Amino acid sequence: MKETFKGENRVSITPDSAETLVKAGFHVVVQSGAGANASFSDAAYVDKGAIVLPGDDFYANADIFAKIRPPSEEEVPKLAGKTLVGMISPSLNKELYEDLAEQNTNVFALDCVPRMLSRAQAYDVLSSQANIAGYRAMIEAAEAFPRFFAGQMTAAGKVPPAKVLVIGVGEFSSLR
C-alpha cells in the first residue's frame, strides 16, 4: 500500500519480500507507485511475481494491506471489511482506530506487539525501525560534522578522531 504521509519514504513490502510471499503461495498485489519513494519500481515488483494495480483496482483486489504509517482519512473507507497490518499507534490515533473498528477492518498494530524476548520478538517493528533511525542519525551527524569522524594521519599532518556521545540504548549504541 502506497504511503501517503508527507516525507515518508519507506515501503512496507519490498520486491524481495513480495517474492517471499509469492513463493509461500500468496497472491501479492502492490499499489502502483508504492515503492517509488524507496527506489523500487513497479517493474521490480512484477519481476518478483507481484501484480501491480492502480488506486481503486488495488483496493478492490486485495484483502490484506500492509502499511508503515496509519492510513489517511481518505484510505479508511477503502479498508472496510479488510485487514490492515502496520504501525497504527492506536493510543495516539484513537479516533482512527475506532473508525476502522466500526467498519469491521481487522487491524494488526505491529507497534503494539510486546517488546520482550519471546516468539513475538520477530514481529518487533519498533526495534528494527529504531535501529535504522539510529544508523541514519550517525550518518547525518557525520555529514554535518566539519571534519573526519575517523582519525587521519597523512603527510600533511594528523587529524584526531572525533569524540561522539551516543545517548540511548540498544544495538546501535554499541557500533563504533
Predicted segment positions?
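Glycine-rich phosphate/diphosphate-binding loop of Rossmann-like nucleotide-binding domains
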Residues: 1-39, 146-176
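Glycine-rich phosphate/dinucleotide-binding loop and adjoining beta-alpha-beta core of small-molecule
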Residues: 56, 64-67, 71-77
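Short acidic low-complexity segments
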Residues: 49-61
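Generic secondary-structure signature for well-ordered alpha-helical cores
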Residues: 23-27, 50-51, 64-67, 102-106, ...
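Glycine-rich loop at the start of a catalytic domain that most often binds anionic cofactors/ligands
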Residues: 40-50
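Short, ordered loop/turn segments at secondary-structure junctions
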Residues: 3-5, 32-35, 57, 70-71, ...
